[in-house]
Amino acid sequence: MKQIRRWQRILILALLSISVFAPLIFVSNRLKSITPVGRREFIEELSKIRFTTNDLRLSAIEHEDGEGLKGPRLILFKDGEFNSSAESDGGNTYKNREEQVIVSQKMTVSSDEKGQILPTVNQLANKTDFKPPLSKGEKNTRVQPDRATDVKTKEIRDKIIQAKAYLNFAPPGSNSQVVKELRGRLKELERSVGDATKDKDLSKGALRRVKPMENVLYKASRVFNNCPAIATKLRAMNYNTEEQVQAQKNQAAYLMQLAARTTPKGLHCLSMRLTSEYFSLDPEKRQMPNQQNYFDANFNHYVVFSDNVLASSVVVNSTISSSKEPERIVFHVVTDSLNYPAISMWFLLNIQSKATIQILNIDDMDVLPRDYDQLLMKQNSNDPRFISTLNHARFYLPDIFPGLNKMVLLDHDVVVQRDLSRLWSIDMKGKVVGAVETCLEGESSFRSMSTFINFSDTWVAGKFSPRACTWAFGMNLIDLEEWRIRKLTSTYIKYFNLGTKRPLWKAGSLPIGWLTFYRQTLALDKRWHVMGLGRESGVKAVDIEQAAVIHYDGVMKPWLDIGKENYKRYWNIHVPYHHTYLQQCNLQA
């Protein structure tokens, strides 16, 4: 009996020893396997538990005061809530912790509810796409996007403005200690900041000089404390600054317009070389081929009015290269006597083997009035583009091409990207002009009648509506036969003469075109003609790629230095920069 009791005591002591030393052994092994990052997380978890005991105790008291105990909230997750492939490792670790807490909460529910909980836990495990564990030494933090900010830069520039303002408050010739220190700190800070626009561009020296500047500004605020005088001075400074900004804007706009009106040196050089080459040819060699197709109505006829060699070349080349049947194309290039030799020589040197090209001199035709140039000068515009004969000669198309019934009118600042032959199959429904409308508010191409036309005039207000839908030149399908029936050229001449006597519309061919073809236009799908590449319009790249014709309307033409670089590439691919004349005139992409 004593032997049995002794063995019982030994067994009990052994079990007690195991219960004491076993946890120590397991915990020590666990701590050895924890990485430095894991130890830091373990300590952070302990600190969170230590500081949240009071909250837990208060929460327990609140539950006791309630009507009854509530079970744990069962959180259901959807497939869309777990997208580990698009998140960082740190984000997945954070989500894994939440899932462990949720599972542990569910395991504490009574056994009666286990049948409902276990399928939910299994569903959670099946739907979750877990990432592999973090490697040793890898940071367990969320990846922050690297965004360049300018908060500190703006703060520093604000302090520079404050310092300049305080210096303006100082009496003339003042040489006090505060003024000296303010000038010194201002020079140092301006030199350190330089032209930085983002915080990443700031040097360490600039950041170190912020605190001394703040101290000097505080001293200056104690010295210059006459608030009414300071307010008056600040208002004067604000007014002067606004005047300077407005003057700079006006100057920039003027220079932009001046650049748009000026012929680049390279283009002038090219025209001179081509003109010289043209007059060195024998008269019989100046003739273009396939002249029998000029007035054949079975062909697809295009017309462009231009005084620019490269611009007209791009329009012709892009149209032919985009066509499925280039042999059916007849292209009429209408220019003036000054540019006729250069443009003729260019197309003689670069003859299109399939299409037919005709070069016309508007000055050799008898379709325009003799005093047309003087009438155009009465439009009170200094911009030669608006008072150009070529710009208004489009209203005489039925007289220029008496043997044709339908044609497509293209401006010389467009690029054709799609086959345009389908335009000839469009039913015009008795209309004269097919065009893309520009009357949808909110779009970059939006234009209103009231912006360009003077509806305060009684004659205009009684005949036209300011809410009528506008449309654009640039790519237009013209029914010349219907034009002749409605005698719209006579209508244009009538309106033009009225406009020379009193201001009825802004200079240019677009406003008078709206009036001449009022209610005579057919709306085309906007993908036929996308505008805005020659100005700040924000046209979408998708719209450009899908467009049949893209239009560089505005002053930022692709052949000018002020053209938008991201849009020039559509134009440059149709310019033969390898040509000898272009290289000699230093014309480059």
Curated annotation (Swiss-Prot):
Subcellular location(s) per record: Golgi apparatus membrane
Tissue distribution: Expressed in roots, inflorescences, siliques, leaves and stems.
Originating species: Arabidopsis thaliana (Mouse-ear cress)
Effect of a null allele: Reduced galacturonic acid content in cell wall.
Gene, per the UniProt record: GAUT6
Pathway(s) the chain acts in: Glycan metabolism; pectin biosynthesis
Cross-referenced Gene3D superfamilies: Spore Coat Polysaccharide Biosynthesis Protein SpsA, Chain A (3.90.550.10)
GO cellular component term of the entry, any: Golgi membrane
Molecular function per GO: polygalacturonate 4-alpha-galacturonosyltransferase activity
Keyword Transmembrane listed: yes
Region (Disordered): 127-151
PANTHER family membership: GALACTURONOSYLTRANSFERASE 4-RELATED, GALACTURONOSYLTRANSFERASE 6-RELATED
Membrane topology per record: Single-pass type II membrane protein
Lumenal topological segments: 28-589
Compositionally biased intervals (Basic and acidic residues): 136-151
Protein's name according to its UniProt entry: Probable galacturonosyltransferase 6
Family per record: Belongs to the glycosyltransferase 8 family.
